[in-house]
Amino acid sequence: MRGLLLAALPALATAAALAVAAPHGSALAEEEEGFSFLGLDLKGSLGEGRHSRYVPPLTNPIFNETPYITTEIRPFYFYHVIPDDFVTDGGHANLFALQARIALTERLAFIATKDGYADIHFDDVLPDEDGFANIALGFKYAFYSDPESESIATAGLRYEIPIGDLEAGGIELQGNGDGFLNPFVTGATTFGDLGLQASVGANLALDTNEDTSIVHYSVHADYEVLPGLFPLIELNGFTAIDNAERSTGALGQLDGVDVFNFGSENRDTTVTIGGGLRYRFNDHVMFGAGGETPITDKDNTVMDYRIYFDLVLTL
């Protein structure tokens, strides 16, 4: 499966090269006709006669998928702090990941949105751990696209392959079970300088004894206060719909939020709020930075707060 990502590198390298060479401040609506590679419409939703505004969400990067069809690579990093009330008396994690998206047509895209390397440090109880996360691949299709009103709606399906190797104190954090199917719907629209986006989906465990199935949901709002500068605010939620049997007792209430799945028998709901900004250097390069923290009880979640940084390189 890693070969699929490697096969995408020629198109993604082209996107990165164009991003570096692009003139500062040009408008997406003034782009040339859609760039074609091997007969693919790599411009996707963006370009002349198509959508002219693209501000992807920042927090919940694994589940809150943009509805726009793009060819891009998106390296991201987050610093994750574990609450002091957690069974380990706190700790922190660093996650480095790379997302890839390839527009096959104006409405259809291949997406690879979960991977990465995690370095986890616990303050007590569990040993420190580092290793690779699972990989999630799939496709999405824009079933509604109206550039005139800057509105778009997209449905997609991802499969999370359980090939990660994260384990702490005998608790498998990644690489357990048979993976997940993740159907989702996402949409966006704009009102002048205001951009709105929302998504909902279900991360369905294929081995329901080992992993917990959840519903995830997100809303995003951004506003262009200066040319290319977009402050944003986001709300994300994660609710168990089918608990597993792998973690019981004190561990049975643990909520791994988006990256980790403890297979808990009594996982609760976590809702987070996030904020930050994006800055668009030109039509092909956008930077993002922000933070996120739960607004629900932190007693049984592994998240106290997160700090995010990413770079969106779009063809």
Residues of each region from the PLM?
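Transmembrane beta-barrel domains of Gram-negative outer membranes and organellar outer membranes
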Residues: L28-D207, I214-L315
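Cleavable N-terminal export/targeting peptides
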Residues: M1-K43
